UniProtKB/Swiss-Prot annotation:
The keyword DNA repair does not apply. This is Mediator of RNA polymerase II transcription subunit 6. It is found in: Nucleus. Residues 220-245 are annotated as: Disordered. Belongs to the Mediator complex subunit 6 family. The lineage of its organism: Eukaryota, Fungi, Dikarya, Ascomycota, Saccharomycotina. Component of the Mediator complex, a coactivator involved in the regulated transcription of nearly all RNA polymerase II-dependent genes. Mediator functions as a bridge to convey information from gene-specific regulatory proteins to the basal RNA polymerase II transcription machinery. Mediator is recruited to promoters by direct interactions with regulatory proteins and serves as a scaffold for the assembly of a functional preinitiation complex with RNA polymerase II and the general transcription factors.
Length: 268
């Protein structure tokens, strides 16, 4: 079973922490157990040298990384870089390790940020000289979990995919707000205004009332036949509301048709 990409992997070892604990002095040792660590790096070489030097230590000498070795290194004229002075002063173990790494060339890992008790940032870099390094990647140790920082390409790709999704969703919703009229062309739906709706309702009710009153008014008698016809029409209109509504709808449609013919088409 193949492992997922390293920038999608989370690694932790509760057993290791239960045995040794996790603090700034041994966070690089904890990191060296993860799949992010390169076993051919200079850190592994220094670690092997330290193990052999401790086994072959003569009486009176101190192993690599001890306080006496650090004092000797400082007395030998090793000057810490300006951006590393704080960590070198607070954590002598890392100062001694970086002193040894500065003598070598190749891949190495150093501690660049400490926020105890649960955050450390480790940097992978290529060393080409005592003061010449190239940053390759950063790793985060948050609590007991180790993560690899994503690349700029992955970050931009993720942001573009997210932007594309939301933009497509917005355009699909915007497309639902467009309506088309033969006389005026395409246009956006206007938001419903409560004031306009109430005015339109009042106008409609007023027009209906006027039409009803006008229909119920008797006309002068011009003859028996006309009087009977008008009375029958008024009675039918006042009794049958559906017929009155049909008459009103016909009148409104005639006005809308006249307005559409006179209107200038507006295209978007």
């Amino acid at each position: 079973m193949s492992l997922p990409p390293l920038d999608e992997l989370q690694w932790k070892s509760p057993e290791w922490i239960q045995t040794f604990g996790l603090h700034t002095d041994n966070v690089l040792d904890y990191f060296s157990e993860s799949p992010f660590f390169d076993k051919t790096s200079n850190n592994q070489v220094v670690k092997m040298q330290q193990q052999f030097s401790q086994q072959s230590q003569v009486p009176g000498s101190m192993p690599l990384g001890s306080s006496s070795g650090i004092g000797a290194a400082a007395g030998a004229g090793t000057v810490s870089p300006s951006d590393r002075s704080l960590i070198w002063e607070r954590y002598p173990v890392h100062a001694m390790l970086e002193k040894e790494l500065m003598k070598m060339k190749g891949i190495e890992y150093i501690l660049v940020l400490v926020r105890e008790p649960d955050l450390w940032i480790i940097r992978k870099q290529q060393r080409d000289g005592p003061t010449k390094t190239t940053t390759l990647r950063d790793y985060y140790v948050i609590g007991s979990a180790v993560y690899q920082s994503p690349t700029v390409y992955k970050i931009i790709q993720n942001r573009l995919l997210s932007t594309n999704y939301h933009l497509s969703h917005s355009l699909s919703q915007l497309n639902k707000l467009v309506e088309f009229h033969p006389a005026q062309g395409a246009s956006f739906l206007r938001p419903e205004d409560p004031l306009c709706s109430s005015v339109a309702a009042a106008t409609t009710s007023g027009s209906t009332a006027s039409h009803t009153v006008a229909s119920s008014v008797s006309v002068p008698e011009t003859g028996p036949i006309n009087a009977e016809t008008s009375g029958a029409t008024a009675a039918a209109t006042s009794i049958d509301p559906d017929r009155r509504q049909d008459s009103f709808n016909t009148e409104i449609m005639d006005k809308l048709m006249a307005t559409s013919i006179k209107a200038n088409p507006v295209y978007i």
